[in-house]
From Swiss-Prot:
Organism: Sendai virus (strain Fushimi) (SeV)
Localization per record: Host cytoplasm
Lineage, highest ranks first: Viruses, Riboviria, Orthornavirae, Negarnaviricota, Haploviricotina
Name assigned to this protein: Phosphoprotein
Coiled coil: 364-429
Family affiliation: Belongs to the respirovirus P protein family.
Interaction with the nucleocapsid (N-RNA): annotated segments: 479-568
Length: 568
């Protein structure tokens, strides 16, 4: 009965108020809807929402939702983005003027009074808290220009700036981080939220301080399209109710206590990225945390006005790059790659140039470019060295092959020399007797195989040995070439000259001759002896005059004696 009386009292206040009083009525109805549709344990657990002002014209309505264990959804009509109600309002009432919407609202209130005979909590629950469409506009037009709730504010911001949503998708961040609280799934009638809890927030949120104009149907359609793409990212990590309020409570309390100018736009995306429960995606973002940033650091474009921190960080990065270059030069010097650190800084080699540029890089793109250049230059230098090594190996192989040819020819030449030496040794063994006699075992001296005429040694008749022709420098002289002093003694000079022509060679001894072979050989012995020229001529002349063998023997004995006297 108290609740019905409270509703009737509010209805009477609505009748006395101007048409602009619908804002307080919707707040009250949303308050009752929250009371009736939630369990007593949930209401007794957290009563922070009781302290929020309901009908204050300065701030927006309660901007938070609460979901109890996946059961009923508690939300204020001024902030709840009811999917079915939003679609029906956009599709059916986008062209309806605000006056008709206000008239329809009053008709719904009259219908509610007509059924006021039913008393008790059941009738109120059937009219207000059944979870369906109660006929009351849950999101009335913003006639007074009050700030919208946080969810709608972010939805319109994301619709106006679709590039922010593209950044979220490109960086792989969950949309709950930048897009604010999640919206219920449309497929289940708005009654379930897939286990995702709503993050409660204060009415004086940092993102809702700007005054927005009346939303256009295009913006609402953009919001609906954004919310329809939400189930594709349902697998992302949901925000837990234990961590989300703790991470956002400092900025909410700060803005709630200090206040902010009415022209303040929603906070930038970096505040949501740098929160405690989200991974640090941007490594090179050197912006200070939320608690240390001032209110005036965020202009309309979302970028900081004062570049002091960025300049300091840039100078710090340059100092770090310089120190890293010094460390790299020291390391290369210690490893023996370069002689000194000055060589690393002043070298014009491609690898060193790209290494210095990579160490001085200001962002990842430049560093990646320089590292790629470093790798390619190192690969090029290594390929060049490989080619040089191949050429060197080829030259070494050619020289080895030439050495093999030289060794082969030298070995063949050595074999020829060895065979020639062995043949000379065998010839020398034939000429000289190395004591192979069986009858003269006492004497150890070597006896020559060719014996000269001597008085002591006449035991063996000596025959002419043709091998004497090859001894020393003695050359074969033809038989019939006479000396000049013998010309006067030639009886028939024409006949002698005629016989000289065919015998003027070493092969003349093979031709038939009138002279006996023995006489011819004796003459050769005399000619090859070390006697003087006159003595040789005298002995040859006396030998030619011999008629018997005894005379020849006597002449040869005289020749041998003269030879012995010369040799001794």
């Amino acid at each position: 009965m108290d609740q019905d009386a409270f509703i009737l009292k509010e209805d009477s206040e609505v009748e006395r108020e101007a048409p602009g009083g619908r804002e307080s009525l919707s707040d009250v109805i949303g308050f009752l809807d929250a009371v009736l549709s939630s369990e007593p344990t949930d209401i007794g657990g957290d009563r922070s929402w009781l302290h929020n002002t309901i009908n204050t014209p300065q701030g927006p309505g309660s901007a938070h939702r609460a979901k109890s264990e996946g059961e009923g959804e508690v939300s204020t009509p001024s902030t709840q983005d009811n999917r079915s109600g939003e679609e029906s309002r956009v599709s059916g009432r986008t062209s309806k003027p605000e006056a008709e919407a206000h008239a329809g609202n009053l008709d719904k209130q009259n219908i509610h009074r007509a059924f006021g005979g039913r008393t008790g909590t059941n009738s109120v629950s059937q009219d207000l808290g059944d979870g369906g469409d109660s006929g009351i506009l849950e999101n009335p037009p913003n006639e007074r220009g009050y700030p919208r709730s946080g969810i709608e504010d972010e939805n319109r911001e994301m619709a106006a700036h679709p590039d922010k949503r593209g950044e979220d998708q490109a960086e792989g961040l969950p949309e709950e981080v930048r897009g604010g609280t999640s919206l219920p799934d449309e497929g289940e009638g708005g009654a379930s939220n897939n286990g995702r809890s709503m993050e409660p927030g204060s009415s004086h949120s940092a993102r809702v301080t700007g005054v927005l104009v009346i939303p256009s149907p295009e913006l609402e359609e953009a919001v609906l399209r954004r919310n329809k793409r939400r189930p594709t990212n349902s697998g992302s990590k949901p925000l837990t109710p234990a961590t989300v309020p703790g991470t956002r409570s400092p900025p909410l309390n700060r803005y709630n206590s200090t206040g902010s100018p009415p022209g303040k736009p929603p906070s930038t995306q970096d505040e949501h990225i740098n929160s405690g429960d989200t991974p640090a995606v941007r490594v090179k973002d050197r912006k200070p945390p939320i608690g240390t940033r001032s209110v005036s650091d965020c202009p309309a474009n979302g970028r900081p006005i004062h570049p002091g921190l960025e300049t300091d960080s840039t100078k710090k990065g340059i100092g770090e790059n310089t120190s890293s270059m010094k460390e790299m030069a020291t390391l290369l010097t210690s490893l023996g790659v370069i002689q000194s650190a000055q060589e690393f800084e002043s070298s014009r080699d491609a690898s060193y140039v790209f290494a210095r540029r990579a160490l001085k890089s200001a962002n990842y793109a430049e560093m990646t470019f320089n590292v790629c250049g470093l790798i390619l230059s190192a690969e090029k230098s290594s390929a060049r060295k490989v080619d040089e090594n191949k050429q060197l190996l080829k030259q070494i192989q050619e020289s080895v092959e030439s050495f093999r040819d030289i060794y082969k020819r030298f070995s063949e030449y050595q074999k020829e020399q060895n065979s020639l030496l062995m043949s000379n040794l065998s010839t020398l063994h034939i000429i000289t007797d190395r004591g192979g006699k069986t009858d003269n075992t006492d004497s150890l001296t070597r006896s020559p195989s060719v014996f000269a005429k001597s008085k002591e040694n006449k035991t063996k008749a000596t025959r002419f040995d043709p091998s004497m022709e090859t001894l020393e420098d003695m050359k074969y002289k033809p038989d019939l070439i006479r000396e000049d002093e013998f010309r006067d003694e030639i009886r028939n000079p024409l006949y002698q000259e005629r016989d000289t022509e065919p015998r003027a060679s070493n092969a003349s001894r093979l031709l038939p001759s009138k002279e006996k072979p023995t006489m011819h050989s004796l003459r050769l012995v005399i000619e090859s002896s070390p006697l003087s020229r006159a003595e040789k001529a005298a002995y040859v002349k006396s030998l030619s005059k011999c008629k018997t063998d005894q005379e020849v023997k006597a002449v040869m004995e005289l020749v041998e004696e003269d030879i012995e006297s010369l040799t001794n």
